[in-house]
């Protein structure tokens, strides 16, 4: 709590006093030195030099020669004021001014001090009689005879004291330290040397003769009110003294004065004496850890002066000099010895280690209740609510405000009911005034009656001061009467308010008046001759007069013991209030030994970043002082905090031993929940407090060790790593015990910390991953919600499942975290008792365990079991960090019984963590756990993926491991050693937007030789583009390599924020790898820390672990399932004119996958690389990329659901194109139409059969000799036919191939203009076209159709040139040719671009010989079709040149896979420019982003049953790839289809987005009218269903065009929580609501389908099928397909017709499928179906539909397109409405109510509503209700 605020007058007087004081000091300095006020600077240097200015001797003083003097050894002879030569002479000291005023100008020489007159040995040590030298006095009343007594108390503890043998002087009446009776210890670690003239004492470590304490550096001064002694120290590394704000844990030795005298003074950046009186310090001597400590048992005011030598000078104004010296082999031992002397810390109550909330001045109990409520709601672990003085009536102890805090006892009971505690503040000052009601203040009256107050100097009159209640008296807690009174008052009040602990404040002791309300007497106690450098330089400032009297003595002597004595008295009170319970005492003022009785907080700090940092030093110092239960006010007490500061402070404060958030009156609340339930601060606080509560068993065990052995809890790094001098100065991080390293962020805006990592194995606490750092400073990335937590290898940590209170958490299962050391060992221990009973250790009522790991064995040994209640708890989980090999078996045993297998374990290879669960090891017994490790076969990564067969010789020559003893025949026999790590990380830079790391090839590690030459220097760049998207890229920073010229939609600068990112990225160093972790689960979702990483010029390889076996994507290739098979299958990717087949690389190139995570999340990964590659899937699970060029450029999308991850990917590559409405109609095509008449015959047959049919195609046979932009003589009537059908509402699409003939004998404008515009691909550095042969035939020859393809190529194919679509000029040329053909030859509505892999019928060029072997036959050839035939097989030569839009050139080797992509946009742009309409482009070859402009069909499939299910897989994959308008050739392209197959395929194809029946020449016709009437009727029926649903389908296509995502949707995208759906691929969804379950096997009328967990309706009947969450046999007729509508959705529909042109004029209808709650919703997107960019230009109608029980409404979201004839609502079908009889249905439309015609089928819960009698259009809102 803060002090009272000063009045304006007081502030004015203080300011004036300070000004006068400063002027006086300046004048004294100038007069004393007679030197200029401005220091002269040597003109040759800007740095002032330090030199002596005068030399003076006074009287008979013999000053040291200037030449030999060490100025840093000067001991100040005038410490009380600025020195003058006159005073110096008067004191007979040496006067030698210096131009640095920090250095004493007047200093002692050897003429001062004492001589030894006699020395004797005693039973405890020795005694020496000292006589004072005849020298002038400093402050009068010198004591001439002094007695030195030494006591060798233990082998490592020496006491020596200097007393007045003739007069009893005040000595500290310590309540634990007792007099030593002897005998003297033998075999001590120290020697004591006493020098006789002048007297000095040295303490020497025997083992190395190091002098630890040496008072010969200065004289002993011993007078009545001034005692001085100095000692030279052997080390510059000293720690301790208090209480002050020490900005650094290690003391600054540069002439620092630290006063010690308890004072109510808030913390600040100065040397003010604060609340406590701590006179212990410690020094570390050397890297062996040897250390010593010094304690002065003295409670009088003093100051400690530290100077650089180093020298410590004590200036004490009373008592005696009573020193204890402690020698230890380590710093920790020294602290233990000190605490053994003063009393080890109390064992805290377990609940007091929980988080506490407090505030000075909540103002009312209602506010406190709200604070408690909101933090409970935020699930903040929170044990204790604390009340400051505002709960009291008029600030009076033992009262509460019955107005503002009315109901306080009930509130406390509510806390208890929730397992929480209540702590109240008590100040020592007791009001002398009556209660607010006028009643007597009984606590005061009872105290008066028992004479318990501190008295004035007369010893009988209570001294009266002023504190919070006004005029007050002060209990004398040193008096037995007072202790009894205090205990009684606490007990009485506890009966009124059932508090659980006490916070004692203001006990320095503090008063708001100087001394008393009478002032203070003018005497040497109130005004001593020397006043240390205390605040205000006034002894009784803010406290009592120094001549006031207590039971232990004068206030002058015992002032600094007030808080100590109050803590002891409060402990007695607690014993009475809580018999046999520990309770909790928190004190502000402390003395040596206070930790036996109370905890401590660091006082009234300020909400600044500096004070948060300084709190660590304060905490560590109080650990030295024996008060381990310590912490600072989290978020700051004074001043307004900020969210960032408070968040960071909450992170740090979660690891204070005493963790309390507390602030002052007048400032905003700062409890965590105040910042908002979903704030980053709340999330971070909850997270780290949960970790604190998880670790409480470990923390509690540390407190047990502090209580039993004096060990530190919050531990300086140097205590554990003393052999490393870097640790001696580390104070921005600290340890819990020996094992948990805590690294907070202490700087505003920082997200990285320069952290020193000591020499040990360290594991990230949150992930369990081993860190590569050791004995080095690192830039640790600590984003906004993170603090550094690292577990030290070699230690075992007990944990417990957390809860929101310790009451609850103590009942939860226990566990262990084992952090293995380098030698795979670890040790630990665990203490457990009931958490609250007093003296359980002393009474043996506890459980104690030791843990030890070695050789994969964990021994859990109970060494003490006398707490039977604790045996109900059990160790349930054991997490072992650093398990380097896969664990194959875990066995367990109890009490030396035989081992049994335990199957419940998982091994995380990314983090090398073994997690063993469900153990049920009850406390009180011994257990053993063993785990077996092996390098699993499934972990092997092939080292010889080459085209030739691996042999042992080739394998070993490469540097890899050969092993033919494989269990799985697919496992590689040649594989990488686990230690393979060719690149080392030379530097890593973290920034708020990403990471940059440099890699260097390490020749000593590069023993494996892979294809091509390795690149020496690499750079890794990580960019946090979005909260859900991260890019990571590896490239050569010194030589520009090819990068994919495909633009992505990514932010120009990263937009992610640290607090909202879904991921964390880390560069691992040994081995190098990139790890990406999902924050929400901690799951590693990318982990390339696997062997085999290579970055060679033409061979790049990287592997990553996968988070599960569920991975989807990569293409284009024919897959047998949607989920990839991870059994060492390799799939090549390189665009090729290759009909689909197993493991055959086909038309497209999509290096994208989506992976599912076991925890129920999904993510996607794109490798932006267009070079040939292959990917191997391994059962690890893992995958390996092998790429033969470019760079590694990955993009990850974090989802977290499959659909969201897909949308995120599409946002980057571009949302799918919006097709025209007509393109959703049924389409017919055939390669092999002989003439126009055949097409006309087909068309007329379809029309006559009334089969829905929108689009007719022609393949290349319409062209003259397969030349683009020509029409063959056999098709001369085709333009007229196209005009005819277009006039009837149909559409026409033509095919265009890229290859342009160059052998024409007559002008061929397409080639001629192309050559003129230089559009064709050429050989590099020449103007020569690289000729190919494709479809175009030579002119003037007769085609022999009996020839094979290869024979025909030689006989009749023309030389053809490939347009270079990367060139700007090519797009212009292509547009002109398309426009010219449209205007001058034939109209069309869409374009089908084929053969654009690009495909050639020769290898590379017409000679089949290319010019660059290295490119066409690269050192590594991916696993592609025709693997040994070269990359140029059936395509262009790899060395041919393309020109990008920026004019730069690239090789076909790099951009081959982009050829189809490069053609797509120019074609789409040309189509729209030509037709002025949206149109559709269908492309065979695709690359990421192509879906923005084109659809895709799945290529030249086969008329086989197995090609049907593969078409579903292909559609779902292309949905992932961002190409939603997809489908397969219905009934198959190759081979003769057959009736049953074509029937089922037509039923399936009716629900392809792109529904086209297409086959090849010389096979039978397979169009619907080519079969029989039954087939015709089946086709008509199923296509009528399609056309009915087109508004719904069109709306879904709009949704993914606007937002990304899937139209053909895998079931798992909607039912991700149902893992059964993760394997389903024989069914699919249209959007979220329409499920298709086709028949994919011959001659069956039963299909086995999965019905996800939702309400489903049979589309054909409208009935609820009553099945969910199970596999079901679905029966159907030959002419039908299973279709189901999902409850909760509304599907807009339209009456079907033969074309979409006609259907769009029919009535709309709605299918309303209610969910279990009779709710549903849906939407309609509607435009004219053909205009370009209607969504982007707001030219559309958008309607939202909602069903709420018995009311259906529509809401208009956009009205940019209205055509009332297209949007007439005619029918509504409501399914699943319940079987309540409906009597009426009403329509509210245009504010008029209409009764409607309806039909209800009660049993089937169907309501059919007819609106055709009313002109209802959807451009106005509707409301339909029934009752």
Curated annotation (Swiss-Prot):
Disulfide bonds: 63-94, 77-93, 88-106, 520-545, 635-646
Entry-linked Gene3D superfamilies: Glycosidases, glycosyl hydrolase (family 31), Golgi alpha-mannosidase II, Spasmolytic Protein, domain 1
Catalytic activity: Hydrolysis of sucrose and maltose by an alpha-D-glucosidase-type action; Hydrolysis of (1->6)-alpha-D-glucosidic linkages in some oligosaccharides produced from starch and glycogen by alpha-amylase, and in isomaltose
Principal subcellular localisation of the protein: membrane
Sequence segments annotated as region (Sucrase): 1008-1827
Glycosylation sites: 99, 455, 859, 896, 904, 1235, 1303, 1325, 1340, 1354, 1368, 1403, 1535, 1572, 1748, 1763, 1799
Region (Disordered): 39-64
Record text on subunit structure and interactions: The resulting sucrase and isomaltase subunits stay associated with one another in a complex by non-covalent linkages.
Protein name (record): Sucrase-isomaltase, intestinal
């Amino acid at each position: 709590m803060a002090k009272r605020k000063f009045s304006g007058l007081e502030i004015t007087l203080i300011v004036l006093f300070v000004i006068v004081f400063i002027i006086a000091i300046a004048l004294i300095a100038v007069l004393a030195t007679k030197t200029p006020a401005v220091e002269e600077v040597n003109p040759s240097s800007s740095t002032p030099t330090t030199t002596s200015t005068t030399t003076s001797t006074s009287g008979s003083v013999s000053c040291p020669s200037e030449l030999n003097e060490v100025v840093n050894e000067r001991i100040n002879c005038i410490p009380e004021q600025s020195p003058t030569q006159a005073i110096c002479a008067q004191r007979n000291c040496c006067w030698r001014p210096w131009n640095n005023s920090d250095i004493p100008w007047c200093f002692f020489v050897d003429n001062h001090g004492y001589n030894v007159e006699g020395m004797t040995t005693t039973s405890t040590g020795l005694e020496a009689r000292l006589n004072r030298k005849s020298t002038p006095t400093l402050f009068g009343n010198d004591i001439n005879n002094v007695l030195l007594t030494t006591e060798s108390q233990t082998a490592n503890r020496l006491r020596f004291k200097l007393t007045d043998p003739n007069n009893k002087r005040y000595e500290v009446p310590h309540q634990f330290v007792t007099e030593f009776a002897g005998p003297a210890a033998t075999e001590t670690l120290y020697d004591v040397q006493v020098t006789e003239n002048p007297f000095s004492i040295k303490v020497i470590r025997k083992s190395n003769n190091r002098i630890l304490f040496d008072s010969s550096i200065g004289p002993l001064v011993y007078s009545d009110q001034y005692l001085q002694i100095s000692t030279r120290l052997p080390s510059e590394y000293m720690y301790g003294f208090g209480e002050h704000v020490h900005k650094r844990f290690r003391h600054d030795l540069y002439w620092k004065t630290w006063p010690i005298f308890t004072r109510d003074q808030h913390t600040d950046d100065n040397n003010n004496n604060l609340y406590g009186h701590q006179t212990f310090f410690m020094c570390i001597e050397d890297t062996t850890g040897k250390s010593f400590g010094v304690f002065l048992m003295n409670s009088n005011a003093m100051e400690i002066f530290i100077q650089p030598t180093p020298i410590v000078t004590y200036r004490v104004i009373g008592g005696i000099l009573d020193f204890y010296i402690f020698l230890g082999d380590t710093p920790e031992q020294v602290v233990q010895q000190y605490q053994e002397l003063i009393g080890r810390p109390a064992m805290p109550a377990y609940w007091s280690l929980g988080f506490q909330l407090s505030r000075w001045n909540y103002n009312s109990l209602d506010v406190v209740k709200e604070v408690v409520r909101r933090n409970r709601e935020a699930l903040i672990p929170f044990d204790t609510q604390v009340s400051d003085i505002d709960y009291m009536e008029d600030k009076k102890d033992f009262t509460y405000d019955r107005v503002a805090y009315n109901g306080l006892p009930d509130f406390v009971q509510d806390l208890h009911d929730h397992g929480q505690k209540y702590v109240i503040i008590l100040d020592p000052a007791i009001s002398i005034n009556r209660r607010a009601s006028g009643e007597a203040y009984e606590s005061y009256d009872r105290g008066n009656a028992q004479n318990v107050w501190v008295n004035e100097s007369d010893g009988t009159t209570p001294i009266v001061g002023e504190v919070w209640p006004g005029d007050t008296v002060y209990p004398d807690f040193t008096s037995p009467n007072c202790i009894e009174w205090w205990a009684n008052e606490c007990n009485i009040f506890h009966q009124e308010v059932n508090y659980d602990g006490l916070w004692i404040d203001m006990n320095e002791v503090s008063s708001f008046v100087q001394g008393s309300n009478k002032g203070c007497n003018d005497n040497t106690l109130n005004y001593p001759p020397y006043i240390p450098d205390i605040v205000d330089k006034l002894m009784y400032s803010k406290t009592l007069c120094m001549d006031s009297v207590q039971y232990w003595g004068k206030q002058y002597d015992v002032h600094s013991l007030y808080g100590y004595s109050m803590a002891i008295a409060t402990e007695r009170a607690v014993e009475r209030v809580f018999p046999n319970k520990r309770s909790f005492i928190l004190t502000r003022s402390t003395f040596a030994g206070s930790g036996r009785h109370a905890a401590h907080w660091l006082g009234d700090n300020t909400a600044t970043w500096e004070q948060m940092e300084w709190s660590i030093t304060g905490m560590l110092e109080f650990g030295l002082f024996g008060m381990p239960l310590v912490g600072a006010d989290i978020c700051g007490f004074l001043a307004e905090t900020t969210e960032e500061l408070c968040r960071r402070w909450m992170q740090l404060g979660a690891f204070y031993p005493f963790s309390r958030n507390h602030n002052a009156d007048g400032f905003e609340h700062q409890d965590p929940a105040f910042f908002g339930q979903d704030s980053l601060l709340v999330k971070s606080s909850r997270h780290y407090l949960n970790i604190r509560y998880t670790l409480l068993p470990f923390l509690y065990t540390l407190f047990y060790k502090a209580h039993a052995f004096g060990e530190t809890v919050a531990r300086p790094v140097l205590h554990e790593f003393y052999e490393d001098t870097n640790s001696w100065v580390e104070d921005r991080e600290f340890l819990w015990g020996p094992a948990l390293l805590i690294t907070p962020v202490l700087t505003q805006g920082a997200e990285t910390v320069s952290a020193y990592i000591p020499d040990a194995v360290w594991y990230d606490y949150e992930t369990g991953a081993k860190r590569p750092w050791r004995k080095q400073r690192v830039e640790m990335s600590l984003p906004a919600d993170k603090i550094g937590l690292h577990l030290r290898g070699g230690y075992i940590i007990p944990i417990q499942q957390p809860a929101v209170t310790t009451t609850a958490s103590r009942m939860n299962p226990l566990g262990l975290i084992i952090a293995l050391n380098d030698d795979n060992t670890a040790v630990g221990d665990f203490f457990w008792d009931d958490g609250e009973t007093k003296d359980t250790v002393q009474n043996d009522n506890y459980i104690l365990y030791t843990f030890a790991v070695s050789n994969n064995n964990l021994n859990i040994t109970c060494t003490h079991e006398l707490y039977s209640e604790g045996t109900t708890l059990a160790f349930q989980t054991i997490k072992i960090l650093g398990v380097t090999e896969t664990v194959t078996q875990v066995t367990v045993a109890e009490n030396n019984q035989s081992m049994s297998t335990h199957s419940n374990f998982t091994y995380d290879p990314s983090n090398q963590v073994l997690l063993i669960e469900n153990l049920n090891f009850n406390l009180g017994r011994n257990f053993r756990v063993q785990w077996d490790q092996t390098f699993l076969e499934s972990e092997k990564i092939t080292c010889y993926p080459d085209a030739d067969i691996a042999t042992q010789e080739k394998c070993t020559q490469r540097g890899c491991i050969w092993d033919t003893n494989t269990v799985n025949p697919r496992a590689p026999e040649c594989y990488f050693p686990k230690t393979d790590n060719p690149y080392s990380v030379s530097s890593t830079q973290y920034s708020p937007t990403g990471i940059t790391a440099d890699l260097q090839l390490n020749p000593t590690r590069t023993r494996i030789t892979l294809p091509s030459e390795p690149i020496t220097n690499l750079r890794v760049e990580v960019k946090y583009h979005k909260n859900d998207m991260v890019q990571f890229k590896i490239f050569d920073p010194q030589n520009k390599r090819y990068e994919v010229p495909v633009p992505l939609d990514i932010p120009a600068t990263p937009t992610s924020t640290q607090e909202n990112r879904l991921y964390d990225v880390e560069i691992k160093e040994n081995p190098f790898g990139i790890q990406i972790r999902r924050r929400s689960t901690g799951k590693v979702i990318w982990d390339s820390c696997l062997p085999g990483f290579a970055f060679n010029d033409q061979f790049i390889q990287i592997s990553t672990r996968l988070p599960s076996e569920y991975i989807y994507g990569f293409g284009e290739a024919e897959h047998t399932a949607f989920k990839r098979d991870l059994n060492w299958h390799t799939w090549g990717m390189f665009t090729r004119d290759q009909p689909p087949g197993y493991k055959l690389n086909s038309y497209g190139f999509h290096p994208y996958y989506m992976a599912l995570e076991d925890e129920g999340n999904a993510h996607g990964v794109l490798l932006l690389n267009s070079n040939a590659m292959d990917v191997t899937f391994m059962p690890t699970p893992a995958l390996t990329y092998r790429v033969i060029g470019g760079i590694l450029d990955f993009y990850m999308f974090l989802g977290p659901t499959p659909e969201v991850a897909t949308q995120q990917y599409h946002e980057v590559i571009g949302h799918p194109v919006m097709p025209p409405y007509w393109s959703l109609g049924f389409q017919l095509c055939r390669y092999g139409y002989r003439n126009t008449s055949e097409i006309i015959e087909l068309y007329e047959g379809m029309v006559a059969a009334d089969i829905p049919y929108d689009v007719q195609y022609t393949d290349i046979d319409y062209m003259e000799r397969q030349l683009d932009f020509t029409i063959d003589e056999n098709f001369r009537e085709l333009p007229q036919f196209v005009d005819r059908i277009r006039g009837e509402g149909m559409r026409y699409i033509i095919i265009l191939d890229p290859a342009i003939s160059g052998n024409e004998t007559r002008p061929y404008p397409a080639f001629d203009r192309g050559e003129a515009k230089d559009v064709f691909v050429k050989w590099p550095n020449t103007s020569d076209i690289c000729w190919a042969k494709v479809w175009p035939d030579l002119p003037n020859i007769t085609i022999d159709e009996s020839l094979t393809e290869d024979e025909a190529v030689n006989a009749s194919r023309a030389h053809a040139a490939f347009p270079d679509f990367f060139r700007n000029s090519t797009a212009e040329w292509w547009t002109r040719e398309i426009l010219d053909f449209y205007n001058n030859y034939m109209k069309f509505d869409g374009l089908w671009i084929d053969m654009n892999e690009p495909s050639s019928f020769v290898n590379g060029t017409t000679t089949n010989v290319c010019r660059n072997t290295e490119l066409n036959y690269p050192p590594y050839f991916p696993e592609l079709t025709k693997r040994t035939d070269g990359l140029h097989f059936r395509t262009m030569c790899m060395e041919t040149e393309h020109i990008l839009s920026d004019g730069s050139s690239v090789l076909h080797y790099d951009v081959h896979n982009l050829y189809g992509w490069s053609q797509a946009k120019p074609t789409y742009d040309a189509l729209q420019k030509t037709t002025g309409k949206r149109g559709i482009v269908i492309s065979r070859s695709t690359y990421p982003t192509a879906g923005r402009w084109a659809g895709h069909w799945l290529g030249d499939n086969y008329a086989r049953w197995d090609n049907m299910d593969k078409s579903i897989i292909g559609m779902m994959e292309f949905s992932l790839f961002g190409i939603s308008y997809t489908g397969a050739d219905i009934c198959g392209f190759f081979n003769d289809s057959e009736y049953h197959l074509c029937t089922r395929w037509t039923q399936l194809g009716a629900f392809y987005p792109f529904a086209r029946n297409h086959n090849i020449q010389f096979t039978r016709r397979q169009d619907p009218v080519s079969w029989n009437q039954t087939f015709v009727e089946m086709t008509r029926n199923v296509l009528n269903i399609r056309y009915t649903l087109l508004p719904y389908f069109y709306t879904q296509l709009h949704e993914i065009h606007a937002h990304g995502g899937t139209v053909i949707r895998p079931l798992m995208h909607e039912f991700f929580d149902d893992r059964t759906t993760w394997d389903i691929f024989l069914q699919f969804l249209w959007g979220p609501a329409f499920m298709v379950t086709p028949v994919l096997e011959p001659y069956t009328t039963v299909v086995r389908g999965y019905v996800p967990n939702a309400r489903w309706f049979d589309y054909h009947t409208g009935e609820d099928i009553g099945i969910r969450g199970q596999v079901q046999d679905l029966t159907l007729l030959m002419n039908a397909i299973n279709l189901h509508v999902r409850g909760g959705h509304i599907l807009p529909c339209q009456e079907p017709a033969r074309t979409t042109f006609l259907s769009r004029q029919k009535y709309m209808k709605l299918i309303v499928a209610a969910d279990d709650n009779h709710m549903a919703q849906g939407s309609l997107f509607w435009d004219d179906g053909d205009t370009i960019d209607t969504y982007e230009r707001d030219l559309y109608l958008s309607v939202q539909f909602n069903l709420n029980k018995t009311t259906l409404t529509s809401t208009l979201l956009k009205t940019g397109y209205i055509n009332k004839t297209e949007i007439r609502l005619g029918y509504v079908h409501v399914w699943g409405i319940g079987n309540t009889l409906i009597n009426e249905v009403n329509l509210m439309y245009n504010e008029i109510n209409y009764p409607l015609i309806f039909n209800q089928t009660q049993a089937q819960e169907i309501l059919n509503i007819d609106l055709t009698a009313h002109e209802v259009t959807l451009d106005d809102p509707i409301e339909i209700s029934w009752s």
